[in-house]
């Protein structure tokens, strides 16, 4: 049965045979498909969300493989410690918690006993694993957004997920540097503030989206080391929206010592061509990628735009699809 939980529960009135069909659903999605309109949310709040969730779980029979709790931002979150404890005893495979709180919701220790987890998504939570926690041995996807966790605990958490393939980190709190040690990682998305990012043992990583709000390169070695650690990189999206001191442009080499031979798709956003750092960085990546097939460039309105496009075509001798945008005046150019 693939109906939303709200509609599935309504089928109980069809016949005696259908009455408890919904109670055996392996996937419970308590999100906007249940809450519906703002008016519905108000009704649920008055009825006490904790009681509603408890009633659903009490009636449910059989395993729960996937559970999602996504509450609107203006709703006071219910006490869900018992809920997570219940799920930990049901071999949960896919768990998503989106909790709208001013202060982060501290995850109970029971979540760290969900050793069958394959997918974990957390929003506005505080993560502090107990000392005895040995990791999620089966986890393949981890998404953390507005989560509070120390740099050391995050590094430990990632390194203790040996099968991790997909990692998403957005606006982490209390995390100044990140070390990612994930031998099976294929895809990495990052957005937020950070001082240091170290990629270690990520030889299979092929897709990276990097949107830093601060970025620092102290020497040519720093940039070289970043790209040497991801030899299998095929798809790169880098956002240059952040301001970078032009003095740091001296740390950008003409081209990387080791070519990015696997890189086929390159996306660079918010490039200011009159900014020496942005220009140096963009040209370095293009010169270092001999097998590029697709480039997407978003350039802040700039008098050097046409000249830059000409140079890109001159450098890239192979067949190339180029999508170029000027952001400020919304001009679009597509070359193929």
Predicted stretch roles:
Residues 125-126, 134-202, 224-227, 273-278, ...:
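Plant-skewed but cross-kingdom recognition/interaction modules and surfaces
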Residues 197-275, 284, 291:
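Extended repeat-based solenoid scaffolds, especially LRR ectodomains
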């Amino acid at each position: 049965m693939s109906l939303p939980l709200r509609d599935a529960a309504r089928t109980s009135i069809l016949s005696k045979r259908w009455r408890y069909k919904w109670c055996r659903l392996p996937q419970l999605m308590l999100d906007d498909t249940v809450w519906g309109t703002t008016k519905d949310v108000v009704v649920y709040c008055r009825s006490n969300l904790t009681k509603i969730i408890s009633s659903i779980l009490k009636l449910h029979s059989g395993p729960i493989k996937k559970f999602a709790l996504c509450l609107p931002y203006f709703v006071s979150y219910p006490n869900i410690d018992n809920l997570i404890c219940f799920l930990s005893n049901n071999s949960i495979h896919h768990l998503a918690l989106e909790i709208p709180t001013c202060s982060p919701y501290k995850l109970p220790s029971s979540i760290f006993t969900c050793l069958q987890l394959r997918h974990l998504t957390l929003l506005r939570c505080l993560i502090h694993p107990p000392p005895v926690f040995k990791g999620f041995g089966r986890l393949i996807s981890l998404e953390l957004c507005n989560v509070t966790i120390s740099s050391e605990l995050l590094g430990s958490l990632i390194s203790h997920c040996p099968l991790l393939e997909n990692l998403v980190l957005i606006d982490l709190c209390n995390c100044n540097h990140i070390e990612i040690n994930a031998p099976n990682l294929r895809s990495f998305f990052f957005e937020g503030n950070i001082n240091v990012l170290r990629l270690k043992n990520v030889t299979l990583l092929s897709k990276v989206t990097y949107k830093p709000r601060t970025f620092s390169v102290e020497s040519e070695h720093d940039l070289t080391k970043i790209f040497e650690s991801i030899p299998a990189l095929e798809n790169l999206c880098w956002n240059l929206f952040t301001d970078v001191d032009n003095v740091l442009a001296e740390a950008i080499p003409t081209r990387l010592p080791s070519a990015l031979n696997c890189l086929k798709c390159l996306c660079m956003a918010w490039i200011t061509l009159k900014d020496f750092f942005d220009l140096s960085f963009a040209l370095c990546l293009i010169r270092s990628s001999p097998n590029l097939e697709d480039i997407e460039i978003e350039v802040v309105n700039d008098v050097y735009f046409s000249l830059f496009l000409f140079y890109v075509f001159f450098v890239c001798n192979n067949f190339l699809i180029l999508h170029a945008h000027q952001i400020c005046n919304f001009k679009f150019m597509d070359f193929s």
